[in-house]
């Protein structure tokens, strides 16, 4: 039953991932799923997905549009798996998580050892088979040796018969010669057969060609025999090589099998060659038959047929001689085969290739025997052919008379045959040359065969000399003059079979541990016990907190050269995907060297689930006296951690600062690099997951990667520093020391050299930039140098290529004017209305003015003229109508200097800050004016007198009814004043004097009192103390001290005390004397001041006239 996997696919920000395809690729076969099959699921726009997944293991691949496929991980669906999200299955612990990397490697090594053991078993079986084949080969070699000897004897007999055949052929040739003489006589009597003789000549040529073919076939047989001799020699060398190969057959069975296959191929080739020899012999036989047939045909020849028969007999004799040589060559080949067979017998103890080589020798011997038999038959056929030719020559004498009567009918045929005969003659010459060359090679081969036969003789063989060798069945002999029999070979084979039985599979190895050590393999028991690597759990030290890093110390047992770099695997636990401490691992080697010459280094693979989840911070090592410890700094929240370490190493997490000689490894560090003492960061995992190494990565071959990041310079040495490939082109940045270039390759040769284009080059010394190709770009700025534009451009119709200046007239640029277009006189009416547009100088008496003429020549207003006088002396314009010219005079253009007439009406008083009156104006000083000359002014001032405004101000006409221009004299508005009198001194006045005198009373009332007795007891009282602060003080000098203590916020009362009495006695002092005041009644006094008056004086104040603050201006008036 399938398990449902569903959820929402989100990115790191929690947003749903869109346009994504989830693929599940089966990694192994299950009950319902076949390996490598693909299943797909497309989440909706909200990222939701739902899949019913069969049991099995799958690789999860995410395909996002526009990005390469991403491998998300591996999930395993079990029969008891619960439904969940894809994240749950990806984050679940797998079998690989439970089995550390080292154990996986152990299992791979076990499999490899098993494969090696299987290979050894196969090699053992092959060796046994090789031994068996060697035994069989030995037996067959002995048999073939006997057969080769028989073949040699047969070949010798064949050679004798061939010699006899040659003698018979020679005798036949003599007879043929005699018959030829008789045929000559017959030819003299047959003069009429000349034309028939031509035909016979053609037939004779054919006979010659056939005889040559026979000779060539015989030569081919000889050549074939020579080839067989060479092959026999090759077989001898192969047999010698087999002897050496047999010695190593037990340890290299595969090589033996290969050699045996090669020998089998050679045997097949020899068989093919023998078959070819047989075919050649049959061809020789056929050619001889053709020769006989041709000789029979010569009966129809005329007198020249006898000569042709004689020639044919000579060729037949040569063929017989060649056949004899062929027989000798066959005998030589047989002898060589006999020798090789003997050598094969010597090497009966050889392994697999020996048997094949012996088989090859047997085949060659049989082929040689067959070839010899064929040669013998061919020789007999050649002798028979020669005899037939001689008989035909004799018969041709009798047949000549009959041929004479047929000469006439043969005349026509003779002409045709003559042409054919010419071509046949040429071919015969070539065949003759080839036959002579073949005969020479046959003689050479025969000579070599004789040399070999004489060398072999019947002497005893040794390791340095060929000959006859004795057989022996001993299996423990060290003799070098005996040959092993099949019995001895079988004993050796049985011994090997017993040692390497196929069904033992290594069970017969006495000391398997020693065997594994010898082949440098690890036993399965060692793998099961995890020998070589230990699995260790390291718990958190006391007091470890999240966010700080704590040392996990991997320590060697001793600092010696026998303990160098150590393999370490350290990892945090598998947690939920959101846990930042999840699955952080380092797998590599560490080497703490302290300050020794061995140095310090580390390298390996670092993994973290996310690049910002750095559970393992770094690896620290001492730079002084500690050459034993490699310290991993781990986040306090990441414990416990798990490690695989080599035997001889220990691992621990100290609970405080670890001090080793001069080095201190800080406990609970925020930044171990700065807080540790006399220790350096060897690997800092701040760059995220990847392969780290503490020193440079140096490779002797290409280095390929997806992206290359660097925090410092990227240094490239050599001529071509950087090659960039895109499409069908390659581009190179090259610095050859003098210049830096951007170079390009030819199309389709992205890894090739650069082409001839030089688009970009910089002089390294001066920085000068050279662009060697066409530049197509939008550039701003100025060029320092330019010679000529590649494509000239037009400026207002004038071509410009940059090589020289150009001149543009006003007409080119449609300009109005650059200088004076022309000069006219004002007295002549100035510039005509239809003059050319431009700026004109118009002269008049004493000065000139500038006139600008705009002439279009079309429309209602065809001309506009404007003129200006110097020093802003006025601006005027006029325009024309159709073709009538100027119909109106100049009109003035008013400016800020020359205001228009409507600025101030005629007659209005205008304040003017100057005594100089502008033209058209007059001062207002009460003067009369000509009302007829200035009618507008007269309308303002009907009296014909301009008011005198000197010293006068202008007052708005009051509502009281005053007339315009009426005057008002000086006046002061009615007002009051306040006054005061000045101070007056009346002097000092006195009253009359009146003395009342002194009045007094008598002094009475003085008296005394007697005093006796005592006072009452009184004065008893208490005191209270409230809100007293607690305090204490010690004081003392020497050995004495006093302590005062006061208690805070407590009320105390003293005891009642102080009651007392007083005794009174004596006389009181005299007292009571006093006086009295006498009152005088209230009264007044009067002082009389006589009648008198006072004078008040008011002083003058003010200006000569009534005025306010003012500035003096002239009043002017516009006249017209």
UniProtKB/Swiss-Prot annotation:
InterPro entries: CarboxyPept-like_regulatory, Gp34_trimer, Phage_lambda_Stf-r1, Phage_tail_collar_dom, Phage_tail_collar_dom_sf, Phage_Tail_Fiber_Structural, Stf-like_N. Coiled coil: none annotated. Residues 985-1021 have a biased composition (Polar residues). Pfam families: Collar, Gp34_trimer, Phage_fiber, phage_tail_N. GO terms for molecular function: structural molecule activity. Residues 129-154, 221-442, 960-1021 are annotated as: Disordered. Keywords: Repeat. It comes from the Bacteria. Residues 221-239, 248-395, 402-442 have a biased composition (Low complexity). Belongs to the tail fiber family. This is Prophage side tail fiber protein homolog StfR. The gene is stfR.
């Amino acid at each position: 039953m399938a398990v449902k996997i569903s959820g929402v696919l989100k990115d790191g920000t929690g947003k749903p991932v869109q346009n994504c395809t989830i693929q599940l690729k089966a990694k192994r076969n299950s009950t319902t799923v076949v390996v490598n099959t693909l299943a797909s699921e497309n989440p909706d726009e909200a990222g939701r997905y739902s899949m019913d997944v069969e049991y099995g293991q799958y690789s999860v691949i995410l395909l996002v549009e526009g990005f390469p496929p991403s491998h998300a991980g591996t999930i395993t669906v079990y029969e008891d798996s619960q439904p969940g999200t894809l994240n749950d299955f990806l984050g679940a612990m797998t079998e690989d998580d439970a089995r550390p990397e080292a154990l996986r490697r152990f299992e791979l090594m076990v499999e490899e050892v098993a494969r090696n053991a299987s290979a050894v078993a196969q090699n053992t079986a092959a060796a046994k088979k090789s031994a068996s084949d060697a035994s069989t080969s030995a037996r067959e070699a002995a048999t073939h040796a006997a057969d080769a000897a028989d073949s040699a004897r047969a070949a010798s007999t064949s050679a004798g018969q061939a010699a006899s055949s040659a003698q018979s052929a020679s005798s036949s040739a003599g007879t043929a010669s005699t018959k030829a003489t008789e045929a000559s006589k017959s030819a003299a009597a047959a003069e009429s057969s000349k034309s028939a003789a031509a035909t016979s000549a053609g037939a004779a040529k054919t006979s010659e060609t056939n005889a040559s073919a026979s000779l060539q076939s015989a030569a081919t047989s000889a050549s074939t025999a020579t080839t067989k001799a060479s092959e026999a020699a090759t077989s001898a060398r192969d047999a010698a090589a087999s002897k050496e190969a047999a010695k190593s057959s037990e340890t290299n069975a595969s090589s033996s099998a290969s050699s045996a296959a090669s020998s089998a191929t050679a045997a097949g080739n020899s068989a093919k060659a023998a078959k070819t020899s047989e075919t050649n012999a049959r061809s020789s036989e056929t050619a001889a038959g053709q020769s006989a047939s041709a000789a029979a045909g010569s009966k129809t020849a005329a007198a020249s047929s006898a000569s042709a028969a004689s020639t044919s007999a000579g060729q037949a004799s040569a063929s017989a001689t060649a056949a004899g040589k062929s027989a000798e060559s066959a005998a030589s080949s047989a002898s060589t085969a006999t020798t090789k067979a003997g050598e094969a017998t010597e090497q009966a103890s050889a392994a697999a290739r020996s048997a094949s080589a012996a088989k090859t020798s047997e085949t060659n011997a049989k082929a040689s025997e067959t070839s010899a038999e064929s040669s013998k038959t061919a020789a007999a056929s050649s002798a028979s052919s020669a005899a037939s030719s001689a008989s035909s020559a004799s018969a041709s004498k009798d047949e000549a008379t009959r041929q004479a009567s047929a000469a006439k009918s043969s005349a026509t045929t003779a002409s045709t045959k003559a042409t054919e005969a010419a071509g046949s003659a040429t071919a015969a010459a070539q065949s003759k040359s080839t036959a002579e060359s073949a005969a020479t090679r046959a003689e050479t081969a025969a000579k070599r065969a004789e040399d070999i036969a004489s060398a072999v003789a019947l002497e005893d063989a040794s390791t340095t000399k060929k000959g006859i060798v004795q057989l022996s069945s001993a299996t423990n002999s060290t003799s070098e003059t005996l040959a092993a029999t099949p019995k001895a070979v079988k004993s050796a084979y049985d011994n090997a079979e017993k040692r390497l039985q196929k069904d033992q599979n290594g069970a017969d190895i006495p000391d398997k541990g020693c065997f594994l050590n010898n082949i440098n393999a690890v036993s399965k028991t060692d793998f099961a016990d995890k020998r070589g690597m230990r699995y260790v759990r390291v718990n958190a030290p006391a007091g470890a907190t999240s966010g700080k890093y704590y040392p996990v110390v991997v320590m060697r047992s001793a600092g010696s050269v026998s303990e160098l770099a150590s393999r370490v695997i350290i990892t945090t636990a598998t947690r939920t995907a959101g846990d930042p401490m999840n699955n952080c691992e380092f797998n590599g080697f560490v080497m703490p060297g302290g300050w020794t010459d061995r140095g310090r280094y580390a390298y390996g693979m670092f993994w973290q689930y996310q690049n910002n989840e750095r559970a393992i911070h770094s690896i620290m090592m001492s730079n002084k006296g500690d050459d034993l410890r490699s310290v991993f700094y781990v986040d306090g929240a990441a414990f416990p951690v798990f490690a695989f370490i080599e035997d001889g190493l220990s691992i621990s997490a100290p609970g405080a600062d670890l001090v080793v000689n001069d080095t201190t490894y800080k406990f609970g560090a925020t930044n171990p690099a700065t807080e540790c003492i006399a220790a350096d960061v060897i690997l800092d995992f701040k760059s995220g997951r990847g392969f780290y190494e503490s020193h440079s990565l140096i490779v002797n071959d290409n280095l390929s990667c997806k992206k290359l990041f660097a925090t410092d310079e990227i240094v490239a040495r050599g001529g071509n520093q950087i090659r960039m490939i895109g499409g069908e082109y390659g581009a190179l940045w090259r610095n050859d020391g003098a210049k830096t270039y951007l170079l390009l390759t030819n199309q389709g040769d992205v890894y090739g050299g650069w082409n001839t284009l030089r688009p970009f080059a910089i002089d390294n010394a001066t920085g000068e930039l050279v662009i060697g190709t066409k530049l197509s770009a939008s550039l701003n700025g100025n060029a320092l140098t330019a010679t000529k534009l590649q494509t000239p451009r037009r400026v207002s119709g004038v071509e410009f290529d940059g090589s020289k200046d150009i001149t543009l007239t006003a007409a080119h640029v449609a300009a109005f004017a650059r200088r004076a277009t022309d000069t006219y006189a004002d007295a002549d009416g100035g510039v005509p209305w239809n003059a050319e547009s431009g700026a004109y100088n118009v002269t008049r008496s004493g000065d000139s003015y500038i006139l600008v003429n705009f002439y279009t020549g079309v429309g209602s207003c065809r001309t506009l003229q404007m003129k200006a006088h110097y020093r802003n002396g006025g601006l005027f314009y006029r325009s024309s109508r159709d073709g009538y010219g100027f119909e109106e005079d100049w009109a003035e253009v008013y400016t800020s200097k020359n205001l228009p007439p409507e600025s101030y009406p005629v007659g209005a008083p205008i304040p003017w800050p100057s005594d100089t009156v502008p033209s058209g104006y007059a001062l207002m000083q009460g003067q009369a004016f000509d009302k007829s000359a200035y009618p507008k002014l007269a309308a303002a001032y009907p009296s014909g007198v301009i008011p005198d405004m000197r010293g006068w101000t202008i007052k708005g006409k009051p509502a009281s009814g005053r007339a315009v221009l009426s005057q008002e004299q000086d006046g002061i508005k009615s007002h009051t004043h306040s006054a005061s009198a000045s101070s007056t001194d009346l002097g000092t006045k006195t009253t009359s004097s009146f003395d009342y005198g002194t009045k007094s009373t008598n002094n009475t009332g003085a008296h005394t009192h007697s005093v006796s007795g005592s006072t009452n007891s009184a004065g008893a009282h208490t005191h209270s103390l409230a809100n007293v602060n607690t305090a204490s003080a010690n004081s003392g000098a020497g050995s004495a001290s006093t302590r005062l203590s006061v208690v805070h916020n407590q009320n105390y009362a003293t005891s009642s005390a102080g009651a007392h009495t007083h005794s009174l006695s004596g006389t009181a002092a005299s007292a009571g004397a006093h006086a009295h005041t006498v009152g005088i009644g209230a009264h007044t006094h009067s002082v009389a001041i006589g009648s008198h008056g006072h004078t008040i004086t008011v002083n003058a104040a003010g200006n000569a006239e009534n005025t306010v603050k003012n500035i003096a201006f002239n009043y002017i008036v516009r006249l017209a």
